[in-house]
């Protein structure tokens, strides 16, 4: 079994490193040749995971031809806004790989497409060869082999089962799902709500406010999931609620951090600079989610206020207080129907 993880950021590095436990041939591919050389020299990703030594068996390269030769599974750990360009550029090398696993969490701004849709379009492959791995998972804790549970989803449940067996580790339990739409929607939109939670913390609004934002944010995520035909229970699982809780409450969360810094008075640009080159997908997904809500007339007040703070310079305090002045509503959407059977 030969697996290549494309993208040498924190999550790509962590996942590639721990997969060496299985005895497979694992390659980590990075775009920047100079950075890859430094990582190889030190056996440490000083750019995104400083302080963690890499498994001696992990191969690291910037050579795309070597990284794709005789590979069984390609895992993409690439920011969603750059995924399509990466696939276009390297399509000729990726053509012979059997399975493609996305780990990115976002929605493409220009097309409002999910990552699995982008992979299918650009590589011209059937959905049964495409999967998404998602759920509550910080790279540092994965490197430390602390217990976690995540989910792998594919439209073909046999594909999900096959990849589940291959990728599960002694400390990493992977569940399977055939609701790739729900898994990708949950993974993307929770980042926007995490920014809102961070803004609330930055403003010093306390635990009550954050709990309300997380809970009502989950409702907004579910509205979009249902719009696209996902199963509501998926959003209550690891890729939805699980990841939402993690990302909205931890100092390790980039999206929460961006929100907190903005709540404390920094501009978006200043907050992003504090991440030192790391990506907070929620900043971009806020645009995608806002466009989806506008085009489909989906009520998403938290998402819309986050968008206004990030892109229309609305005061963070005014944005969160405006949520309290919305029309009083029933807690459960009046047109919500769900048949358990």
From Swiss-Prot:
A GO molecular-function annotation: NAD binding
Compartment list: Cytoplasm
Pathway: Membrane lipid metabolism; glycerophospholipid metabolism
Entry keywords, A to Z: Cytoplasm, Lipid biosynthesis, Lipid metabolism, NAD, NADP, Nucleotide-binding, Oxidoreductase, Phospholipid biosynthesis, Phospholipid metabolism
Enzyme class: oxidoreductase
The EC number(s) this enzyme carries: 1.1.1.94
Xref: InterPro entries: 6-PGluconate_DH-like_C_sf, 6PGD_dom2, G3P_DH_NAD-dep, G3P_DH_NAD-dep_C, G3P_DH_NAD-dep_N, NAD(P)-bd_dom_sf
Main location per the UniProt record: cytoplasm
Active site annotation, chain numbering: 190 (proton acceptor)
Residues noted as binding NADPH in the record, renumbered to the chain: 10-11, 31, 47, 105, 139, 254, 279, 281
GO CC, alphabetical: cytosol
One of the GO biological process terms: phospholipid biosynthetic process
Reaction it catalyzes: sn-glycerol 3-phosphate + NAD(+) = dihydroxyacetone phosphate + NADH + H(+); sn-glycerol 3-phosphate + NADP(+) = dihydroxyacetone phosphate + NADPH + H(+)
Residues binding sn-glycerol 3-phosphate: 105, 135, 137, 190, 243, 253-255
Purpose: Catalyzes the reduction of the glycolytic intermediate dihydroxyacetone phosphate (DHAP) to sn-glycerol 3-phosphate (G3P), the key precursor for phospholipid synthesis.
Family classification: Belongs to the NAD-dependent glycerol-3-phosphate dehydrogenase family.
Matching HAMAP family: NAD_Glyc3P_dehydrog
Name of the protein: Glycerol-3-phosphate dehydrogenase [NAD(P)+]
Gene: gpsA
